[in-house]
A protein has these predicted regions:
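N-terminal leader/linker segments that initiate helical-solenoid repeat arrays
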Residues: 23-119, 123, 345, 353-356
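Helix-start (N-cap) detector for alpha-helical repeat units in TPR-like alpha-solenoids
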Residues: 65, 99-102, 136-137, 169-170, ...
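Canonical tetratricopeptide repeat
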Residues: 101-107, 141, 174, 210, ...
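Residue-level recognition of tetratricopeptide repeat
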Residues: 107-110, 144, 177, 209-213, ...
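Structural motif corresponding to the intra-repeat A-B loop/turn of tetratricopeptide repeats
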Residues: 112-115, 149, 182, 218, ...
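TPR/TPR-like (Sel1-like) alpha-helical repeat modules
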Residues: 164, 226-236, 299-323, 330-334, ...
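Terminal, low-structured helical/coil segments at or just beyond the last alpha-helical repeat
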Residues: 242, 247-254, 266, 313-356
């Protein structure tokens, strides 16, 4: 009996606590909903809202900047305009007007080129390249402007950078000429080789002539001969290249044919070598090298008589090839006379008489 009463009391307590908890939760929820209903919107400052509405959009520059930019852009003098725009960019490095300032330079450079104001063009192009180092138009403008004003050091500085971006025979020719003026033979040769194949023989002549000396000095006979042949092809008999006197041109032809002959000889084309050396002697009879190699060619052709005469003439001139010519002459003569030199003096006397 007591157990039933105890169980009844426990159940009653659970019901009471459950009701209280449920009622408490319900009351809290109602209070929260009431707070939400009573919450008022935040007040709006009408004056601040009006200011915000009238605020100008951010264009990336001030009115003062714009006026300064327009003043520079509208300068009638192209040099002053470029200087003004450059100064604006330096003064306002973050201004959105800088893009417009930069875009004005190509027009300025083109107008200076059309006006043939190369001194100003060089200055403007060089200044622009400080701001935009890889600009193709500015590189080309600087190259041509400084070449025109004979500032060859700057011409090659900007010209080589331009050639990397826009290679052409015309640019190579300008660089070759500039390096020639700067006495930089290696660079001259490099760019001359690039432009000559695209030029006609007469236009290429000055470059071919200089290259013939360049390679001959370095004992590169094949290349020297190649350019000598181009020289000889440029002007016919009776013609004289610009800048040459007739006497100098005669000497040049003698030298060129001698180099051509030497190249044929080293390639064992002895018949062609004889023709080239005879051409050289036509313009310069005192060419000891020509007589010596003619002797060697005739020896190879088993024409011993003509070979001995040629060696004798080379010896009689008393020039650098004389000693070698005498040695070759004696060797050949001994082969023909059982090791004896008896009678060789007669050949030498005849050769000496013919050379007078």
């Amino acid at each position: 009996m007591k157990g039933k009463i105890f169980l009844h009391n426990v159940l009653l307590l659970l019901l009471v606590f459950g009701f209280v908890e449920s009622w408490g939760y319900s009351q809290e929820q109602k209070q929260e909903e009431k707070k939400e209903e009573q919450k008022e919107p935040e007040a709006v400052d009408i004056e601040d809202a009006a200011k915000e509405g009238n605020k100008a959009p951010d264009v990336g520059y001030t009115k003062e900047e714009y006026d300064e930019f327009q003043k520079a852009l509208n300068k009638p003098d192209l040099k002053l305009r470029a200087e003004g725009l450059s100064q604006f960019i330096k003064t306002h490095p973050s201004s959105k007007l800088n893009e417009h300032a930069m875009n004005a330079f190509p027009t300025i450079m083109k107008q200076l080129y059309e006006q043939k104001d190369m001194a100003t063009l060089g200055s403007v192009a060089e200044g622009f390249l400080q701001m935009k180092p890889d600009d193709v138009l500015a590189l080309g403008s600087a190259m041509e402007a400084f070449h025109s004003t004979r500032d060859y050091a700057k011409a090659v500085k900007y010209g080589e950078a331009y050639y990397v971006k826009q290679p052409s025979a015309q640019v190579a020719q300008l660089l070759a000429h500039s390096y020639g003026e700067l006495k930089n033979d290696a660079k001259f040769a490099s760019y001359a080789e690039k432009c000559i194949p695209e030029m006609n023989a007469k236009d290429a002549f000055p470059y071919s002539a200089k290259l013939s000396y360049y390679y001959a000095d370095r004992k590169d006979i094949p290349r020297a001969a190649q350019h000598c042949q181009k020289m000889m092809a440029a002007y016919g008999e009776g013609e004289t290249p610009p800048g040459y006197t007739s006497e100098r041109w005669v000497q040049e032809k003698a030298r060129a044919y001698s180099i051509i002959g030497r190249n044929y000889y080293e390639r064992k084309q002895f018949g062609n070598a004889v023709g080239a050396y005879n051409n050289s002697l036509k313009y310069y009879r005192q060419n000891d090298e020509a007589y010596y190699y003619l002797g060697m060619c005739f020896w190879q052709a088993n024409d011993s008589v003509t070979a001995l005469k040629s060696f004798a003439k080379a010896y009689s001139l008393n020039k650098p090839y004389s000693k070698t010519a005498r040695s070759s002459m004696e060797t050949l003569y001994k082969q023909l006379h059982n090791g004896s030199l008896e009678g060789i003096d007669a050949i030498l006397r005849t050769a000496t008489a013919e050379m007078k």
